[in-house]
Amino acid sequence: MLNEFKTFIARGNVMDLAVGVIIGAAFSKIVDSVVNDLIMPIVGAIFGGFDFSNYFLPLSSNVNATSLAAAREQGAVFAYGNFLTVLINFLILAWIIFLMVKGVNKLRDSVDRKKIEEKPDAAPPPEDVKLLTEIRDLLKTR
């Protein structure tokens, strides 16, 4: 059973998946930083200097706080600001992945085109095949 497990782990697909998950986790942190530290402050400046993550709607009448943390202590709130931040984060990540896939597909297409261009022309058919083709064509015309 141990040998079977070693074979399973040593397969390329499992290793590729492990590397992908690790890189994805690190990449997610980069995107979070880009959104929270670079994009959201600009969006906040454009829309009057506010922070989306602090936006909420009170769901109970005793919530009258102005910050999300204080409002959560007072009662139930609908914290849609954090959702907006996460949504923007997702859209940026999806856009970056789209651009990466598009680039890889373009590279793959150019490699495939080069392979097609590099293929030598097909060898001319042998004389007997040419003769049989001519006979077939003559029989079709009759």
Curated annotation (Swiss-Prot):
Pfam families named in the record: MscL
Residues that span the membrane, as ranges: 14-34, 38-58, 81-101
One Gene Ontology MF term: mechanosensitive monoatomic ion channel activity
SUPFAM superfamilies cross-referenced by the UniProt entry: Gated mechanosensitive channel (SSF81330)
Transmembrane helix listed as a keyword: yes
Topology of this chain in the membrane: Multi-pass membrane protein
Cross-referenced Gene3D superfamilies: Large-conductance mechanosensitive channel, MscL, domain 1 (1.10.1200.120)
First-listed, main subcellular location of the protein, grouped into a coarse class: membrane
Places the protein is found: Cell inner membrane
Family per similarity comment: Belongs to the MscL family.
Subunit comment: Homopentamer.
NCBIfam families: mscL, PRK00567.1-4, PRK13952.1
Protein name, UniProt field: Large-conductance mechanosensitive channel
Organism: Agrobacterium fabrum (strain C58 / ATCC 33970)
